[in-house]
Amino acid sequence: MKPKNVPREIFNPFTNKTSLGTRREGLFLCKRLKLRPDNYLEEYCADLEVIDIMAPIRPADETERCPPTSTSDDQEAGDYLVSRNKKSRNSDYMLFSSDALVHIAHDAKVSEKYTWLGERLRLTFKMMRSDSRLIRTMCHSHGFMQCSSKNPSVNVIWMGAPVKSVRMRELMPWQRLNQFPRSTELTKKDRLYENIERSKSIFGESFDFIPEFYVTPRENRKMENAFVRVAKEIAAAGGELCFPGEFIVKPTNSRQGKGIFFANSMADIPAEGPLLVSRYLKDPYLVNNHKFDLRIYVAVTSFYPLVAYVYSEGLARLASRPYDTSASSADSNEYVHLTNYSINKNSTSFVRNESMSSEDLGHKWTLGALLRYVENEGKDAKLLMLRIEDLIVKSLLSIQNSVATASRTNLRFACTNFELFGFDVLVDQALKPWLLEVNLSPSLACDAPLDSLLKTRLIADLLNLACVPLLDRKIIDSVTPALRKSMNSQESESSETDDLELDPMCAKTLKRRPVGLKRSVLNKKIVSGSTSLIPNNEKKFDQIVRKAELEDGRRGDFIRVFPRNGTWGMYSPVMEDLGNEDFDERLFDEVVTKKNTKNSSGSSKASSSSASASSSSSSMHIEDLSDLFHEVMMQCDKYSSIADVPIEIREIISPWYEEASEYTKKITQEGETYACKLPVIRSTARLRTKSCAEFYEVRKVQLAKKKESEAMASKENEPIVLQAVVAKRI
């Protein structure tokens, strides 16, 4: 161990010079940089003898960039970092704001309000297998420079397709990647359904939110028996087969509604696969006689322990033609029974919502507009959202074991990963939500004004949850070689024990756990294989705790659904054991229990209400309460409103129920002006490296040639008479 006060070189960002100093002097410099205790990056770089890694937001002696004037626009120019969430702290991490897009256009009066900080620190991002205009616009509007996909040292990496888990081992502690390893366990349709079905076989009807399903070709025999059984059941009841089909068939790895069709027999199923064949839900809840589904945006910042958020703003996508199960609708199957926007926008009946003020116009509504419609129908919309939150948490828990195992192996540093999922949910007549699929990198296209407003806010809040560190490029360049050397040496030292630590049987033990096997017995089987490749698990856990506390002030319009008050007691009986660290329970104690204790100590009202809640539920064991809770979540006919919910459960979920009112709010405010589309970025703010700029130039030429060839091909295919008429007019 090195002595603490041995003189060494310390970089001072105030003077841009390196001088000889001691660790004590370095810590003093950290105070000048306002390095907070929750900045976990200090721990990594302290081992590399780099103390002052965080760049200051603004030195005390820096002069104002914009001279004060009497106009409101110029007065606004003094606020360089603005957030919709007033609780956010902006000293160590970048604060993203949807307001920044207003100042990135050519005609912006205050052009450097948000870009100056990113440009000064030379923050960078790259996009791989994605060309989302919204992501590029958001990053450029905060001063980020776009790099080529081959650059390994960028601050933010945005992927549009699955990343190989081994590539995540190269992530540095200051980098942010929008994916977790093995998240395809959730986003591939067959794996999603199989994971939830496995959890259902272990924990029972608590996971009853997916329809009956089969995966071809490996389950062809079971599927054939299912077709025969369904036909017999319908014949015995004197009914007819559902039109367009009793089963709906989807490719397991497709999106945007591609390749979907209906089936009533094995003859309708092609031999090639794999395909997901699931029971068609033929009694959907209708809005103005139209079928719909919900797009719910979910952010995850950690899988072990699980930290999950649901965005308070979402979308309701309506079918473009009225719902009809008769054979007369055969000519418009897809526009009646499918709700995918990419399909229905091609229908002649599709109505676009071009208004910013009307959230329930056309065939794409906001989530809040649909929930207000449900409330006007006399239904409990907030209880519906609690059931959707429950569905989301259980879906994430069903893959937690797989993702946690991969994360231990491939994520060297805490808090480098985050992910945005798009949950597609169908609601039936009993107001029971059913999970259809989960989308990896959900569409961020802004085809309508409400799309632009909602998704711009969504991405700003998502990046705030990611906590992108404010690091000067000089610091990164100086630290990276030493850190990579340390990582490589750790890799070589751990290679000798890889066989023990990566035993695949350890990861699969829980999947094969028989129903009724006690966890204490199961734990004994996996203790020997629970060692992680990353040594300091406790330090990583402490970092996750600090980041989770920080996220609470940076979440914007996200609602944390796990962990929060009551979640540990309700969900721990349906959670798999991931090791003897108990990170989920400990995070709940750190983030929820201690916070409640601190808040209740100064409020007699809070303590009295807490006492009444505990006394009313003390007569029931925690596992009995959990069973009753999951019964309430699944049996929507029996518990159709909050008044029908037993008092013991109502006291637990009442804070959730109150918070669910955030989903029903309008996303626009009267008197406010909103941009109807993404701005065109001015050239001075569209920062790109040379290689990245060359890539876009080449692509621009290729697209122009492709467009020209398509125009020539269409012209050659025109009828001769039409060409003659056009020539005559000319």
From Swiss-Prot:
Protein name: Tubulin polyglutamylase ttll-5
Region of interest: Disordered: 594-618
Protein's UniProt keywords contain Ubl conjugation: no
InterPro entries, per database record: TTL/TTLL_fam
Organism: Caenorhabditis elegans
This enzyme's EC code(s): 6.-.-.-
One GO cellular component term: ciliary basal body
Entry's family note: Belongs to the tubulin--tyrosine ligase family.
Positions of the TTL domain: 120-478
PROSITE patterns xrefs: TTL
Positions annotated to bind ATP: S278, R279, Y280, L281, K291, D293
Statement: the UniProt record of this protein carries the keyword ATP-binding: yes
GO terms (BP aspect): microtubule cytoskeleton organization; protein modification process; response to hermaphrodite contact
Record Pfam families: TTL
Top-level taxonomic group: Eukaryota
Gene3D superfamilies, alphabetized: ATP-grasp fold, B domain (3.30.470.20)
GO MF terms, alphabetically ordered: ATP binding; protein-glutamic acid ligase activity, initiating; tubulin binding; tubulin-glutamic acid ligase activity
Biased composition (Low complexity): 600-618
Protein task: Polyglutamylase which preferentially modifies alpha-tubulin. Involved in the side-chain initiation step of the polyglutamylation reaction rather than in the elongation step. Together with ttll-4 and ttll-11, required for male mating. Probably by regulating microtubule stability via the glutamylation of tubulin, negatively regulates axon regrowth after injury in PLM neurons.
